């Protein structure tokens, strides 16, 4: 016996089939757009039904970047640079195909890269719940309408101060959680 195993499935049909065939659970990470992730969840549920297995939706984590602030402007001021840095690093790491060691300064790499990562605005619209309590509540309720029951919140965004992380978490607890 072993504890449940979760696999952060990608768009790959093979990965989804592997986890379904081996009775593993899916995990949705922040690297997928919400729309694509919901489509993947639909395919996961269909695959579970075809195999007569429970989909365990109450235990399937669906992760999003989350930052709650009193105003949208403050939320953006707090996290924009951090979200963009995360995207830079994720793109940078994909280029390290021959090694796991970083032997180049990220600023040097930024000067020679041939594509830009997703912007803050794109991440906010497609992978993040960033804004006022009301805006975040609306986004969470939209997920719930698709059967998502377990939201994983990435509050700590790449160098965001502990003070700002805790302020966001407190605001989430006080103004968002009671409504979801």
Where are these regions (language model features)?
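Hydrophobic faces of well-ordered beta-strands that scaffold small-molecule active sites
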Residues: 5-8, 24-29, 58-65, 151-153
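An alpha-helical appendage that flanks or caps ligand/catalytic pockets
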Residues: 35-146
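Internal, glycine-rich beta/alpha segment that forms the wall or movable "lid"
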Residues: 1-22, 35-42
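C-terminal helical cap(s) of enzyme catalytic domains, especially alpha/beta-barrels
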Residues: 36-47, 160-180
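Conserved, mostly hydrophobic/aromatic
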Residues: 5, 19, 44, 75, ...
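Long, low-complexity C-terminal extensions of enzymes
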Residues: 132-156, 160-173
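Active-site-proximal loop/turn and secondary-structure-junction residues that shape catalytic pockets
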Residues: 11, 32, 66-68, 157-159
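Glycine-enriched alpha-helix->loop->beta-strand junction motifs that scaffold or abut catalytic
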Residues: 18-27, 147
């Amino acid at each position: 016996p072993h504890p449940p195993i979760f696999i952060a499935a990608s768009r790959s049909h093979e990965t989804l089939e592997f986890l379904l065939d081996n009775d593993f659970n899916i995990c949705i990470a922040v690297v997928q757009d919400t729309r694509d992730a919901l489509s993947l969840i639909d395919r996961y549920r269909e695959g579970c039904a075809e195999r007569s297995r429970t989909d365990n939706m109450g235990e399937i984590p669906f992760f999003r970047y989350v930052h709650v602030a009193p105003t949208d402007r403050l939320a953006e001021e707090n996290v924009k640079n951090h979200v963009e840095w995360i995207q830079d690093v994720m793109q940078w790491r994909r280029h390290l195909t021959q090694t796991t060691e970083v032997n180049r300064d990220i600023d040097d790499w930024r000067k020679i890269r041939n594509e830009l990562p997703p912007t803050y605005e794109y991440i906010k619209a497609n992978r993040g719940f960033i804004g006022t309590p009301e805006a975040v509540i609306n986004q969470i309720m939209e997920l719930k309408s698709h059967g998502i029951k377990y939201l994983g919140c990435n509050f700590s965004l790449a160098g965001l101060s502990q003070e700002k992380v805790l302020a966001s978490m407190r605001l989430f607890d006080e103004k968002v959680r009671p409504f979801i």
